[in-house]
């Protein structure tokens, strides 16, 4: 048999090595690859139908995968009877199929537990038993093949909690008071082992009856002595039901401090008839059977995974267990190896941390609360949470009556509180943590996104070893975080911070409180620090400190920019100013023309006598160019008076244009309007019109106030409310806006207004519903008075004012200094009037063009035919040239024909004896009538149009005079060129056509 097995293993190893070489399989070379290979975990189901159904449901979940392509198969077996023989046969049937490596059992009696331990040791197959507390019994020496897990809190864990309380109070001598314990001697021994000290008294009350004086007489040993002292400082009550514990505490004499050793739920703890200061403990949440079964399957899977990595051949080749032949080497090797790995396995499961001690005792995470019977503010007895115990660590709340556990150095350990908060600017901000998951500034806080207590406990436990994902780590800072840090420093406590899972302040929904209030009531947090409004509904279920911030409710609206009208671009100046500007422009142009034509140095024929003249149209062009700041080719006046007037007009235009542009931006944006609301009693809120929407934050103090005071208003606004304040502000500022008004705490609204970059938000109306922000704590918390006292000190010392200045000292929106790069953005609708004006200008240009053609084709020929209005040089040089030079364009063709025909002859006289006009002889000569000098114009010789003889002589005389004028002009032009060359003038000389044409004509 052994040789066959060895040969088979050799073949398998060879195949594995070949597979690794050929395919690069990542498995070790000695591990055979068998597709679909599986190992089996058997489950011996409980007899109760309800428990059996729950176990089957837990086993139906997919089993975890194992290394080396292994799978874990779950096999469930139910035994019809629970006698020892049937149970033994059932377990042997469970272990008979091949591949079964371990089993899970649910013993319901002590004989079953003993039988399971015997069979596990005999078959060397690990068995994990899930026990109830009453099934526990002494089984002799523990065996590594039988692991036990207590579903409920085991007695050892309860004793650990009690011993931690005794040591925290520094009680050296205590008394054990037992109500109904099966083996008092074993219990006392167990206490002595845990406390390292035997109790001073042990009172067994199982035979004493409360209906007579026997119970009171038995407890008299614990009463105060004659000297005023007590025999023991504390007494621990164990094994008592709620009713029996009430009877014992009512009959107990005054003196010792009582501890209820049996965990009880909070609602089962009595409050009347008990001595003050009684300490009780209770498990916060008992683990479900499904979670326990899941973790036990995970325990076996974790051990199998570890074994498969170290000894893959034992995990892959488990042998069949035969109860008739228990000497099988393969089974012995696999079972012992798996038992050794089970004893060293620990992981984080659904029940929390899971670990094994002593190779046979399985532990899961336990969490207990410690309560103390106190007096509430009205004097009534009430239970208050004073501490908590988890996985061997006892933590007291600050201000609790219990003493702290002394540290080795003699200093007192700082307790740790769990604080819940809610992000609300500026009281609490959040940002991402750094690459290492730490916060250089602010406090590290978790954002779990859930309100599950087990999940929170697991996350904070993982935070200690740094295994929390970075996505859940946040850095919290703000007004309330600074206040919390100061309180922690003055009250000497540490804290761990997390953000509320549902993001709500808290309201009563379907009989349960949500948000911050729900976390305080469920014991998930010791205090709530944020902008937590104090109101009557919340004060009935949780406690608040004195307010550290006073505020009220307010209404925030958004300003709207009205559209600018078409003529908005003219609004910077009054209509009278526009009329005055254009009237001054035309009047200035007129005076410029008059000064230029009356000056001996003006650009006119009488003045400088050049080819161009300064007319009224030139003056208008110049004045418009100066007014609108455009650079065009325009004629400028040459006389000093005209230039002075031109500069004066430029100064006038500069001042007017500067004033216009300074007011243009504000006018073009348009007016800012907003919803005018006088307050919460405004008719717009109580009788909203169609389309008017307003809301608040869900489950906030503002919603609670409106719901209680104005139910109809709340019915209208609840469908428009937002989950948080930033969401509500975003709905108000969206485009188009989803809200017309937003109601919330005025302190939060004022901050949103101060940081609004667009200056679109403002608060309106009178404040209402004066309230304050306080720190929330569970009812009857001993921290309330201490925190309130320190908050009052902070107000008196000015620390609260410093916090307000730090987080609220913002630049008001109306006085904000804009950056240089920040510009006013205006759309097309702002300049709609200018576009309309441009379109009108295009239409007017068409009319002007039509008028130009009418003047050129109809008016101009009529003026040419007449003798009046021939001199237009002072008004328009173009019109003057058109009247006194060549023919109109319509006569161009006829002029060309006449130029190609016979030479022009002198006109003859008509029959009336008068000379006809000789315009035809010079109609192609483009000339300008310059004013001649008086001496030259004073001759008495007749002109062309004159009557009389001597025409040939006069013509020759004129030609001589023209030649002389040309010579003088040539000399002048040459001299001007020389002067310009000397002065550095780069202007090129005009072509001297007259100078070049003279020799040709001669």
Curated annotation (Swiss-Prot):
It comes from the Eukaryota. Pfam families: Lig_chan, Lig_chan-Glu_bd. Glycine binds at residues 531, 533, 538, 701, 745. Residues 951-984 are annotated as: Involved in the trafficking and surface expression of NMDARs. GO terms for biological process: calcium ion transmembrane transport; cellular response to glycine; ionotropic glutamate receptor signaling pathway; modulation of chemical synaptic transmission; monoatomic cation transmembrane transport; protein insertion into membrane; regulation of calcium ion transport; regulation of synaptic plasticity. GO terms for molecular function: glutamate receptor activity; glycine binding; ligand-gated monoatomic ion channel activity involved in regulation of presynaptic membrane potential; monoatomic cation channel activity; neurotransmitter receptor activity; transmitter-gated monoatomic ion channel activity; transmitter-gated monoatomic ion channel activity involved in regulation of postsynaptic membrane potential. Belongs to the glutamate-gated ion channel (TC 1.A.10.1) family. NR3B/GRIN3B subfamily. This is Glutamate receptor ionotropic, NMDA 3B. The lineage of its organism: Eukaryota, Metazoa, Chordata, Craniata, Vertebrata.
């Amino acid at each position: 048999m052994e040789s066959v097995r060895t040969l088979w293993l050799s073949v398998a190893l060879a195949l594995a090595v070949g597979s690794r070489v050929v395919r690069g399989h990542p498995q070790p070379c000695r591990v055979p690859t068998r597709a679909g290979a599986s190992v089996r975990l058997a489950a011996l189901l409980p007899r109760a139908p309800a428990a059996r159904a729950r176990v089957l449901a837990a086993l139906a979940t997919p089993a975890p995968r194992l290394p080396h392509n292994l799978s874990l198969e779950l096999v469930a077996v139910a035994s019809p009877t629970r006698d020892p023989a049937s149970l033994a046969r059932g377990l042997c049937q469970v272990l008979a199929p091949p591949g079964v490596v371990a089993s899970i059992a649910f013993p319901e009696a002590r004989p079953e537990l003993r039988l399971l331990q015997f069979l596990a040791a005999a078959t060397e197959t690990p068995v994990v038993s899930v026990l109830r507390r009453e099934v526990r019994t002494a089984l002799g020496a523990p065996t590594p093949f039988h692991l036990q897990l207590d579903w409920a809190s085991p007695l050892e864990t309860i004793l650990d909690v009690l011993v931690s309380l005794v040591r925290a109070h520094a009680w050296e001598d205590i008394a054990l008071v037992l109500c109904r314990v099966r083996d008092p001697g074993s219990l006392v021994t167990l206490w002595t082992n845990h406390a390292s000290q035997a109790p001073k008294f042990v009172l067994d009350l199982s035979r004493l009856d409360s209906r007579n004086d026997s119970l009171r007489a038995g407890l008299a040993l614990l009463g105060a002595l004659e000297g005023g002292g007590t025999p023991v400082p504390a007494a621990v009550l164990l094994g008592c039901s709620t009713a029996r514990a009430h009877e014992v505490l009512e009959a107990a004499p005054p003196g010792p401090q009582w501890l209820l050793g049996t965990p009880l739920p909070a609602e089962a703890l009595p409050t009347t008839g008990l001595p003050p200061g009684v300490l009780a403990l209770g498990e916060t949440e008992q683990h479900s059977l499904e979670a326990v079964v899941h973790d036990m399957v995970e325990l076996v899977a974790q051990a199998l995974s570890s074994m498969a990595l170290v000894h893959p051949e034992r995990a892959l080749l488990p042998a069949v267990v035969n109860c008739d032949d228990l000497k099988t080497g393969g089974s012995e090797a696999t079972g012992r190896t798996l038992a050794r790995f089970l004893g060293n396995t620990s992981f984080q499961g659904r029940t929390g941390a899971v670990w094994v001690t002593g190779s046979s005792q399985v532990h899961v995470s336990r969490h207990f609360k410690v309560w103390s019977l106190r007096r509430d503010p009205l004097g009534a007895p009430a239970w208050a949470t004073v501490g908590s115990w988890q996985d061997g660590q006892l933590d007291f709340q600050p201000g609790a009556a219990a003493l702290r556990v002394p540290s080795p150095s003699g200093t007192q350990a700082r307790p740790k509180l769990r604080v819940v908060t809610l992000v609300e600017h500026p009281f609490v901000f959040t940002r991402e943590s750094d690459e290492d998951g730490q916060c250089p500034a602010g406090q590290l806080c978790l954002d779990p996104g859930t309100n599950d207590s087990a999940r929170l406990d697991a996350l904070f436990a993982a935070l200690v070893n740094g295994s929390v994902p970075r996505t859940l780590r946040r850095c919290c800072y703000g007004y309330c975080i600074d206040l919390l840090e100061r309180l922690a420093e003055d009250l000497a406590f540490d804290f761990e911070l997390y953000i509320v899972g549902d993001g709500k302040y808290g309201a009563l929904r379907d009989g349960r409180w949500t948000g911050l209030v729900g976390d305080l009531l469920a014991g998930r947090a010791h205090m709530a620090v944020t902008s937590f409004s104090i109101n009557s509904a919340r004060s009935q279920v949780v406690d608040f400190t004195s307010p550290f911030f006073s505020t009220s409710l307010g209404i925030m609206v958004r300003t709207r920019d009205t559209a600018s009208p078409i003529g908005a671009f003219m609004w910077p100046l009054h209509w009278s100013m526009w009329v005055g500007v254009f009237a001054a422009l035309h009047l200035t142009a007129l005076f410029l023309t008059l000064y230029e034509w009356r000056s001996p140095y003006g650009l006119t024929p009488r003045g400088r006598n050049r080819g161009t003249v300064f007319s009224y149209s030139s003056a208008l062009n110049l004045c418009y160019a100066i007014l609108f700041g455009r650079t065009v080719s325009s004629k400028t006046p040459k006389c000093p008076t005209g230039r002075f007037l031109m500069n004066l007009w430029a100064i006038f235009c500069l001042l007017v244009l500067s004033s216009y542009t300074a007011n243009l931006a504000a006018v073009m944006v348009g007016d800012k309007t907003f919803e005018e609301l006088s307050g919460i009693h405004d008719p717009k809120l109580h009788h909203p019109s169609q389309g008017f929407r307003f809301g608040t934050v869900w489950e906030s103090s503002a919603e609670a106030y409106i719901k209680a005071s104005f139910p109809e208003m709340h019915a209208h606004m609840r469908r428009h409310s937002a989950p948080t304040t930033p969401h509500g502000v975003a709905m108000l500022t969206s485009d188009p806006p989803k809200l017309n008004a937003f109601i919330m705490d005025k302190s939060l609204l004022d901050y949103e207004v101060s940081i609004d970059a667009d200056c679109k938000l403002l608060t309106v109306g009178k404040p209402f519903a004066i309230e304050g922000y306080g720190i929330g704590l569970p009812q009857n918390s001993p921290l309330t008075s201490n925190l309130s006292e320190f908050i009052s000190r902070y107000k008196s010392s000015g620390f609260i004012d410093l916090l307000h200045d730090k987080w609220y000292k913002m630049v008001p929106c109306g006085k904000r200094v804009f950056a240089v790069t920040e510009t006013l953005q205006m759309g097309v609708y702002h300049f709609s009037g200018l576009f309309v004006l441009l379109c009108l200008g295009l239409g007017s240009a068409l009319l002007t063009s039509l008028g130009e053609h009418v003047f050129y084709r109809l008016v101009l020929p009529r003026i040419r035919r007449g003798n009046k209005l021939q001199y237009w040089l002072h008004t328009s040089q173009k019109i003057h040239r058109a009247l006194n030079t060549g023919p109109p364009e319509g006569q161009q063709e006829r002029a060309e024909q006449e130029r190609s025909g016979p030479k022009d002859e002198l006109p003859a006289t008509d029959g009336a004896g008068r000379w006809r006009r000789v315009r035809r002889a010079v109609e192609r000569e483009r000339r300008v009538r310059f004013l001649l000098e008086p001496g030259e114009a004073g001759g008495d010789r007749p002109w062309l149009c004159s009557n009389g003889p001597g025409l040939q002589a006069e013509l020759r005389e004129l030609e001589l005079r023209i030649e002389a004028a040309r010579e003088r002009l040539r000399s002048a032009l040459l001299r001007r060129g020389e002067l310009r060359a000397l002065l550095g003038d780069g202007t090129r000389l005009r072509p001297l056509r007259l100078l070049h044409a003279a020799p040709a004509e001669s």
